[in-house]
Amino acid sequence: MENILDKFLRYISVDTQSDPESNSQPSTNKQLNLLNLINEELHALGIESSVDEYGYLMASIPSNIEKEVPAIGFIAHVDTSPDASGKDIKAQITSNYDGGDILLNKEKNLYLRVSDFPEMAQYKGQTIITTDGNTLLGADDKAGIAEIMYAVQYLCEHPEIKHGEIKIGFTPDEEIGRGVVKFDVAKFGAKYAYT
């Protein structure tokens, strides 16, 4: 089973910035590159999925229980902020974080400082993933995509885990306020959904 970190690193490698100046939906075609990649991954797992003309990917994992229960959904967005470059992202992985400042970029003297972000201390001993200071990281919301896709893969590989119908949705253009403009709630079909 592919680990969640590898999924995340693959997803952030795809530039998916949205464009507030565009009148199309999705606002950039590059968002479709990631949507199509995810769609292929879902098909490889045997999951029915499709991407519509507006850049919404919807998928469904059938229930494997006899009892009828409401469908639940999980949703994440594929676009990244237009405020910083999302091209050629170079993730830096700090394993067993020591609790101190993290150097992002030596040439720019750019650090994540504990004095600026004291909550960093609670992650001592864990793995921290950052940008190299030249681009955004894209964790909003490619971390969400990786979590959802890891869960989907896990459920597909562990049919002994009983569940009702699960709906999956990936949307474009959230960063520019258009993420749900043409999202078809009825087609999605979840009684409850989590983002």
Where do the language-model regions lie?
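Acidic/His- and Gly-rich active-site-bordering loop/insert found
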Residues: 2-127
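Acidic/histidine-rich catalytic neighborhood of metal-dependent amide-processing enzymes
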Residues: 121-195
